[in-house]
A protein has these predicted regions:
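Conserved catalytic region of serine esterases and O-acyltransferases that act on ester linkages
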Residues: 179
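Divalent cation-coordinating acidic motifs and surrounding scaffolds
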Residues: 1-176
């Protein structure tokens, strides 16, 4: 059959609408935190779609300090909430994963309280999940509270060596998404 210009225009518009639908973009960032007196309190690496860069940033961090009780978790959370370039898109999924093995210092007074920080995160549309490494019960209680107040999930990460890396068919594709 013969296509009229209106038909061609309608079909082109339909194709352009389909092609123009944005696919989800994954952006990740890091905020490393330690404690006062360590070589740094926080190091923030802003959100990026380049997952290779996130991995490189992660490799620049080394464990240090620690083992001496609470850390400046509140400053790390504050930086994650306020210093990352979060999307302003209403439909964007915005999540923080707090990962650590120590409870927060709540006696410094240089940040809002844990409750205030998590309320701010929720108001900004952020979900705060908490992954506790190890089995310290005080840290576990704090991380459970973070997940509850941050409307996220608590994720225990055992440190007994029983964790295994499992390759998936999606690993190569995930790496490509960051390029």
């Amino acid at each position: 059959g013969i296509l009229h210009s209106a038909d061609v225009s309608a079909r082109l518009n339909a194709i352009l609408e389909r092609v123009g639908i944005p696919s989800p973009r994954l952006r990740m960032g890091l905020v490393a935190f330690r404690d006062k007196g360590d070589s740094y309190v926080t190091k923030a690496f802003d959100l990026t779609g380049n997952l290779d860069q996130v991995y490189k940033d992660l490799l620049t961090l080394e464990a240090g300090g620690g083992g001496d009780g609470p850390e400046h978790v509140l400053q790390g959370l504050s930086d994650a909430i306020d210093k990352m370039s979060w999307s302003s898109e209403a439909k964007a999924v915005k999540a923080i994963y707090l990962v650590g093995d120590a409870s927060p210092h709540e006696d410094y007074g240089d940040t809002p309280s844990l409750k205030e920080l998590l309320q701010k995160a929720v108001r900004k549309g952020l979900v705060v999940n908490a992954a506790q490494c190890g089995s310290d019960s005080t840290a576990g209680d704090a991380f459970r509270l973070v997940a509850r107040l941050g409307e996220g999930r608590f994720l225990p990460v055992p440190q007994d060596g029983g964790m295994a890396a499992v390759e998936t068919p999606f690993d190569a594709r995930t790496a490509e998404l960051g390029r």
